[in-house]
Amino acid sequence: DSMTVDELLAKWFKEYAEPQLKPQTVSDYKRLVPRISAAVGHIKLSKLRPGHLMQFYTQLQQPGVRMDGKYKVTASFIKKFPKGKRKALVAAAGVAERTAARIWAGESTSLHTAKKLAEAANVAFSKAFVNTSKDEKLSGNSARHYHRLLSSVFNTAVRWQLMAENPCARVDPPKVEAADVQYLDEQGIARLLAALPDAPTQYSVIVQLALFTGCRRGELCGLRWSDIDLPAGVLAVNRTLTSIPGQGLLFSTPKTKKSRRVIKLDENAVQLLKDYQQWQLRERLRIGSKWVRTVEIMGKTVDNDLLFTKWDGRPIDPAGLTSWFPRFLRQHDLPPVRFHSLRHSNAALLIAAHVPVTTVAGRLGHAQVSTTTNIYAGFIRSSDAKAADALGEAFSRILHEGAG
C-alpha cells in the first residue's frame, strides 16, 4: 500500500524491463520517466486514480512542454567566452569541437548539450541559452508513448499483485493526429543524388542504399557483407545497430520479427555495392594494421565485414549520420527532410508504381500491413485516384471503339 509510482517504476525497470526488453527500448522508456515522475511519481499506488492520468496526458499536450527543443547560445554567453576562452570550456564540458563550433556560429543544439556547456561555465542556464521552440508541444503520438509505458508498468503491477487493476484501462489514450509524412519526390531525389558526389563515400552510399531499400538507419549501419548476395541481388536484414546512452554502440535483433527480412536489389543498387566493396578493400589496404579485424556482434566475436565503418573499421555511429544529413541538405539547398524521410521516399516511389501494399509492407519490415496503410494513406489515395483515372480512360477507349 505504501509503494509509490516512482518506486514501482524503479522495480519494473530492474526486474522486468532490463532483463526482458531490448536495450534501445529500455533507453527510450527511461527518457519518459522524468515527466512521469514529476506528475505522478509521488502518488501511492493505492491512491492513484484515472483522473491523475487524464490530467497528466492533458499537460503533455500543452505548449512549452517539450524538453527536447532547440536551444541557441545567448549574446551575453558569447561575450563572456570569446574565442580564446572557448577551447577550455568545450573540453571541460565534454562537447565535441565540431558541435561547439556550430553552437558558437549560432546553430541550435539539444538541451543535453546546452546544459553541459552552461554547467561547465558555471553560468545559469537561462543566461547561457534561449529556447527557440518554446511554443512546441508533444505530438499525440509522442504523448501516447507515455500511456503505453504506464499501461505496461501497471499491467505488470497487477500481475505482481501490487495493484488491483490498471488505471490506464479507464483512460482514453492521447489522440494521435494524422502526421504529414516528409519525403522527397522524384525531383528532390534527383537533386539529392546529384549532390552526393560531394559527400563522404560511406555516407553517399548509405543514403543511396536507404533510397533503394527503404531500410531504417540502424538496419543499414548494422549490415555486413555476409548479409548480401551480390550475384543474386538480395540483401538480408538480420540486425540493427543502436547507440545506447551509457553503453555505447550495440548490435541487436531487428525491431520486430517482420523486420528480419530479405530485400531484392535492382541493378543500380547491386552496381553501387560492387563499386563500394572495391573502394572499401582499397581503404583496408591503405589503413593496414590499424584496421580493426574483429567486432563483437550480439555476444559473439566475428570477422569484421561491416559495410559501413569509421576510418579504422570500427562500427559507424548512427547518430553521426543523423546529424550530418541535415547539414548536408542545407549546404546544397535541398529540402529540409530527416534521414528517416529516405525510407518514406522509397515507400512513396513503390506506391506510385502501383506495387501492392502487402509487398511494400514486406520490404519495409512492417509488423502489420495496417501500419503501412496508416502511415502512407495519403500516398495510397493519390495512387488509387490515378489508377481510377487510368481505368476511366481505358473504358472510354473501349466504349469509343465499340461504338465505332
What are these regions (language model features)?
Residues 106-108, 175, 241-243, 364-390:
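Catalytic-site neighborhood detector that most strongly recognizes the C-terminal catalytic loop/helix
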Residues 25, 99, 142, 167, ...:
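Residues in the helix-turn-helix
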Residues 91-93, 136, 194-204, 213, ...:
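Short, basic (Lys/Arg/His-rich) helix/loop patches that form interaction surfaces
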Residues 90, 118, 210, 221, ...:
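The alpha-helix within a helix-turn-helix
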Residues 62, 194, 232, 243-269, ...:
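C-terminal secondary-structure termini that scaffold catalytic or DNA-interacting sites
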